[in-house]
Design a protein with these regions (language model features):
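Short, well-ordered loop/turn elements at secondary-structure boundaries
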Residues: 33-35, 45-46, 166
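Phosphate-binding loop of NTP-binding sites
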Residues: 45-46, 59-60, 151, 155-157
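Short, charged/polar micro-motifs that form catalytic or ligand-binding hotspots
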Residues: 5, 9, 38-41, 45, ...
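A transmembrane-helix-recognition feature enriched in membrane-embedded lipid enzymes
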Residues: 1-29
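Glycine-rich phosphate-binding P-loop
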Residues: 40-59
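PAPS-dependent sulfation machinery
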Residues: 68-166
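Post-Walker A helix-loop "phosphate-sensing" segment adjacent to the P-loop in P-loop NTPases
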Residues: 57-67
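N-terminal signal-anchor transmembrane helix
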Residues: 18-40, 69-81
Length: 166
């Protein structure tokens, strides 16, 4: 039943994925270039979430919403359509630190990227025996070819483009 649900979800979302890809690609050339991102680096429990929340209050900074994190390929279509339903499904706060979660709370772009590409240290959480390999390739690009790195950059740029179009 779980495999059937996964296949059904993938097939059902395919028209939205393809449509959103076509739309975002058609906008890429005429779109104002996206400024280079600012990366917030820090150790867990060091205040990075607070800094991100403070910065997100200034309109010059963009954020990755919970919907973009969960539906990065369909954020403009399914994300909008299901926003009321998804809003009800959001937890009141993050379980690890009691920080409130709202539909416009900034989230880590790395989680969205993990949903979009195989190059992410987050995959090591699901495959702990390969954690070191996922970490090194996802953080340091260790062992990746130039083509792999270019593919990751394209996915990152696609995510940021969609966030500016949404």
């Amino acid at each position: 039943p779980q495999a059937l649900a996964a296949w059904g979800s993938a097939i059902g979302s395919l028209p939205f994925t393809v449509g959103e890809w076509a739309y975002s690609e058609s906008q890429r050339d005429g779109h104002t270039p996206i400024k280079p991102p600012v990366f917030i680096l820090g150790h867990w429990r060091s205040g990075t979430t607070h800094l991100y929340n403070v910065m997100s209050e200034d309109d010059q900074w963009g954020i990755v919403t919970p919907f973009a994190t969960g539906l990065p390929w369909e954020v403009m279509s399914l994300g909008r359509m299901f926003k009321p339903l998804l809003r009800k499904g959001l937890p009141e706060h993050r379980y690890i630190d009691n920080v409130p979660v709202e539909d416009d709370s900034p989230q880590e772009d790395e989680i969205a990227l993990a949903n979009m590409t195989d190059i992410s240290f987050y995959h090591g959480l699901y495959f702990p025996k390969k954690f070191e390999s996922f970490f090194n390739s996802g953080v340091f690009f260790e062992g990746l070819s130039g083509d792999d790195i270019e593919r990751w950059q394209r996915v990152l740029n696609t995510l940021y483009l969609r966030l500016t179009l949404d």
